[in-house]
Amino acid sequence: MKIVLAYSGGLDTSIILKWLKETYRAEVIAFTADIGQGEEVEEAREKALRTGASKAIALDLKEEFVRDFVFPMMRAGAVYEGYYLLGTSIARPLIAKHLVRIAEEEGAEAIAHGATGKGNDQVRFELTAYALKPDIKVIAPWREWSFQGRKEMIAYAEAHGIPVPVTQEKPYSMDANLLHISYEGGVLEDPWAEPPKGMFRMTQDPEEAPDAPEYVEVEFFEGDPVAVNGERLSPAALLQRLNEIGGRHGVGRVDIVENRFVGMKSRGVYETPGGTILYHARRAVESLTLDREVLHQRDMLSPKYAELVYYGFWYAPEREALQAYFDHVARSVTGVARLKLYKGNVYVVGRKAPKSLYRQDLVSFDEAGGYDQKDAEGFIKIQALRLRVRALVEREGHGA
């Protein structure tokens, strides 16, 4: 049997690699995706080979990640439950897509992942896998093995020659990519406890951020960001640049309790500096270029799209149908937003667009601009008709 494993290089997936070989008598191919997590991917590849993988594949997927997954999601204005910009959720279908592709190319019968049986990631990986290859076998060791805790896993690692880090384990789990870093579990499981001050990696503590604000301009073309401060950049380079700018000003920290797809609530702490800047910049340009009813309709549909991404339905027909709508709407989003960053805050201070629907002559108190204020009286009376009828009916009812 041949299995392709999503391999991070950490202790858990190294244990899984050995466990798969023993339990399934299988040849294991390790696949590591570089999506900007900041870890040495080549080291992970070499470690996989030392741990027993027959082959180790490492791919730089940063550009594909941002171009084909993050930017389409951003065109939809997707935010889960009002705060979460979906940094972990959007990475899983990309990883699973390549797991399936490699399995097909290598003639593997199964894929495997290291997601636990309590979280969302198991669903995201597997929904993608089954959507792309309905007959694929998916192995989820956390749902199968008998380890009762961390001590048993470490004992297994030591018995099988898997290096165990000598540094003290972090009191929380962490997942990173080019869009964000997430922190969960451990000391964060108490929703009343403030996150440890030294936990954050992408962002400066807002209290210690520079005392002078920094201005940044983001240019959009047909829905996607293309330049920062006048410099055109590739999708991954643009997001990285905004991460650096936003990070030094403490932008993009979020601490929430969210509803997992599997039914439980969990606390997540996130850093999304570049994504937060892009969210505000996009809305600033949209305020000029989108028709009122289109904007309102888009905002009604965005939460459903965000839910689909969060749950793992990236390759579902309903997500693809919504994407076609959002892509059509985004074609008019061309312009520039100017933002001021200061101690964790993002302030929109300017916006412009070549096809702006904002007409200064219409809103000016000094110019008529073709708008006859007398017309407002009839407009108001028509809008008030149903309200007046309701009031009259209620009054007659009371009189009876």
UniProtKB/Swiss-Prot annotation:
Source domain of life: Bacteria
Keyword terms: Amino-acid biosynthesis, Arginine biosynthesis, ATP-binding, Cytoplasm, Ligase, Nucleotide-binding
Name recorded for this polypeptide: Argininosuccinate synthase
Catalysis performed (reactions): L-citrulline + L-aspartate + ATP = 2-(N(omega)-L-arginino)succinate + AMP + diphosphate + H(+)
Pfam families this protein is in?
Arginosuc_syn_C, Arginosuc_synth
InterPro entries according to UniProt:
Arginosuc_syn_C, Arginosuc_syn_N, Arginosuc_synth, Arginosuc_synth_CS, Arginosuc_synth_type_1_subfam, AS_cat/multimer_dom_body, Rossmann-like_a/b/a_fold
Q: Tell me the subunit arrangement.
A: Homotetramer.
Protein's UniProt keywords contain rRNA processing = no
Q: Which residues bind L-aspartate?
A: 116, 120-121
> What family does this chain come from, according to its entry?
Belongs to the argininosuccinate synthase family. Type 1 subfamily.
State which Enzyme Commission number(s) the record gives. 6.3.4.5
**What NCBIfam families does this protein map onto?**
argG (TIGR00032), PRK00509.1 (NF001770)
Q: Which GO terms describe its cellular component?
A: cytoplasm
Among the record's GO biological process terms, what is one?
Answer: urea cycle
Query: Which EC class, in a word?
Result: ligase
Classification of source organism: Bacteria, Thermotogati, Deinococcota, Deinococci, Thermales
- Copy the pathway line from the protein's UniProt record: Amino-acid biosynthesis; L-arginine biosynthesis; L-arginine from L-ornithine and carbamoyl phosphate: step 2/3
| A GO term for molecular function | argininosuccinate synthase activity
Q: Which residues bind ATP?
A: 6-14, 33, 114
This protein's major location comes to cytoplasm
Q: Where does L-citrulline bind?
A: 84, 89, 120, 124, 173, 182, 258, 270
Q: Where in the cell is it found?
A: Cytoplasm
